[in-house]
Design a protein with these regions (language model features):
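A glycine-centered beta-loop-beta connector
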Residues: 33, 41-58, 107, 115-132
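The conserved cystathionine-beta-synthase
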Residues: 20-37, 43-45, 93-111, 118, ...
Length: 159
C-alpha cells in the first residue's frame, strides 16, 4: 500500500511542542532552546492559548539592547526579565487543515522559521517549521535517512 501524500499542515506539523509562559524568565527560555536545539518557543497562557512567540533572535536582540552595564551583569539582568518583555505578540499562525503549499508560501515570503498551529480558539496544537519541510522533502525523495540522523549531523557540524 502506497502512503498518501501529505497535503495539510496536520500531516507534517510537530505535535510535541515545548512552550513557555509570559512570566517565565528569559534564562528558562534560553535553557529550553539550547537543551532542545529549538530556535523558537511558543508563549502560551495556562490554558494553552497562544499569546506570542519567543525566538533566538529576540534573545540576542534583548542582550544587545543595554550596552551601558558591564557585559556579565547586563546578561544576568536581562535573563531575569520575563518572556513577555521581549516576545513577539503579532504572530503569523496556521490551522491544521490549512494546505502545506499555503503554509510553505507564508514561511518563504515572510522569511520566518516557524508557524504555530492553532485551532479556532487560538489554542496551540503544534508547530510547523522549515525543518518539517526538509523532513518531508527527504521522505518524498525516497531517502531512508531518519530525521534524527539529520539532526545529529547538524548538531555535530554546528555544535
Amino acid at each position: 500500500m502506497t502512503p498518501t501524500m501529505p497535503t495539510t499542515v496536520a500531516d507534517v506539523m510537530t505535535r510535541k511542542v515545548v512552550t513557555v509562559s509570559e512570566q517565565d524568565a528569559l534564562d528558562t527560555a534560553e535553557y529550553g532552546m539550547h537543551r532542545m536545539h529549538f530556535r523558537h518557543l511558543p508563549v502560551v497562557t495556562a490554558n494553552g492559548t497562544l499569546v506570542g512567540l519567543l525566538s533566538h533572535a529576540d534573545l540576542l536582540h534583548a542582550a544587545s539592547s543595554s550596552l551601558s552595564a558591564k557585559e556579565a551583569e547586563r546578561n544576568a539582568l536581562i535573563l531575569q526579565q520575563p518572556v513577555k518583555r521581549v516576545m513577539q505578540r503579532e504572530v503569523l499562525t496556521v490551522q491544521p487543515e490549512d494546505s502545506l503549499v499555503q503554509a510553505g508560501k507564508i514561511l518563504w515570503e515572510s522569511k520566518i522559521g516557524c508557524l504555530p498551529v492553532v485551532n479556532d480558539e487560538g489554542a496551540l496544537l503544534g508547530m510547523l517549521t522549515k525543518s518539517d519541510f526538509v523532513r518531508l522533502a527527504l521522505q518524498l525523495l525516497g531517502s531512508d535517512v531518519k530525521l534524527s540522523d539529520v539532526e545529529d549531523l547538524a548538531r555535530a557540524r554546528h555544535g
